[in-house]
Amino acid sequence: MKLPNKLGPIHFIGIGGIGMSGIAEVMHNLGYTVQGSDAADNYNVRRLAEKGIRTFVGHRGENLADAELVVVSTAIRRDNPELALARERRLPVVRRAEMLAELMRFKSCVAVAGTHGKTTTTSLVATLLDAGGLDPTVINGGIINAYGTNARMGEGDWMVVEADESDGTFLKLPADIAIVTNIDPEHLDHFGSFDAIKDAFRAFIDNIPFYGFAVMCIDHPTVQDLVGRIEDRRIVTYGENPQADVRLIDVDLKGGQSRFRVMIRDRRPGFRLEMEDLVLPMPGKHNALNATAALAVAHELGVSPEAIRRALAGFGGVKRRFTRTGEWNGAQIFDDYGHHPVEIKAVLKAARASTEGRVVAVVQPHRYTRLASLFDDFCTCFNDADTVIVAPVYAAGEAPIEGFDRDALVAGLKSRGHRNAVALERSEDLAAMISGLAGPGDYVVCLGAGNITQWAYALPGELAALGEKAA
């Protein structure tokens, strides 16, 4: 039995979340009556309202109205008034991943998992399949610039989704093709140990049907180890590793883009295909690897090399992934979602390769638990930044943890040899600090999953205003 076509109003609690908003939009486009609430007004809430979806700011029981089904994200507490009333009324309550899984049953599905790179890779897979005429439905964890949204209804037989492993619910998703970009220690508050994370990813691969396959990056040692433990399922490996089925070769990172070629070698004797002169308008080897994963899927689904080449060259990127927000005094300012040490290191390495000027990193650590559990890694992931400006921790509802805060990170960076790590007292002070640091050819990269994105977009104007005031 599949999701009924006739279903009463569906109420989303936390509809402004990036994952929830995408599901809500697709269900609205399928003809379901959708409504929802969020604690605060944001871009996604406004975007959904513009599409005719009834939205509420703030959580109140009366928002449920005549809803017959409630969808909740894992961020919603049990004492939420809307959730409490729904349970009092004995309404069905489903988690975000359960509803996503129901939508996936309508199509053949590609699910993109991994600690980092999921959103960009999901966007790239969607772009390549679209270029091949497959017209996929897409539900992503970030805004795809070409669509202006994180969700899109396609007329084709395929759906491409980002599979969020943070709470383990990605194991509910019925994928025909599974991508694993990497596996690092993250979300330990849920999993408890790195071994538990690795076990979850193994289960994710084991869940694919016998006619499906997994695309896995063997440049990452944990993923390569997992490949060796998977039995009875087809695996397509990718990476710079000379043993990869889809091998990334000759990566050239200059001018804010990536040039490379890819060699495809099937396990069938004698099969070999080389794609040369590939260009991705995004910097960083990590993004070239993401593109290689997407290319592997597109090739398997019959997309031509020329369509792949054209789509990669025209890729418009994803919001909050090395997104340029403006320029001041010849310095470029960027916004990036990177909040894990592996992500931060990759972004700063890409910035370093893209400019001959200085790289100034502005970081807002996200969650005390993440800073504490990965503290040593945070203290060593900023080597490619000439200057690191550390803002107060964005708590995301967590209580402070003694010894793991802004000042501890500044001290940790310095003790491990960084030459210029400084604390930011208030966001209002950022423009003045940058004005004394950045000049022509420099990159200012704002990093974090909190509200630092707002600082990144405000910074060019604030710097210009400072200049006018000084004049």
Swiss-Prot record:
Pathway: Cell wall biogenesis; peptidoglycan biosynthesis. Gene3D superfamilies: Mur ligase, C-terminal domain, Mur-like, catalytic domain, NAD(P)-binding Rossmann-like Domain. GO terms for biological process: cell division; cell wall organization; peptidoglycan biosynthetic process; regulation of cell shape. It catalyses: UDP-N-acetyl-alpha-D-muramate + L-alanine + ATP = UDP-N-acetyl-alpha-D-muramoyl-L-alanine + ADP + phosphate + H(+). SUPFAM superfamilies: MurCD N-terminal domain, MurD-like peptide ligases, catalytic domain, MurD-like peptide ligases, peptide-binding domain. Cell wall formation. This is UDP-N-acetylmuramate--L-alanine ligase. It comes from Methylobacterium nodulans (strain LMG 21967 / CNCM I-2342 / ORS 2060).
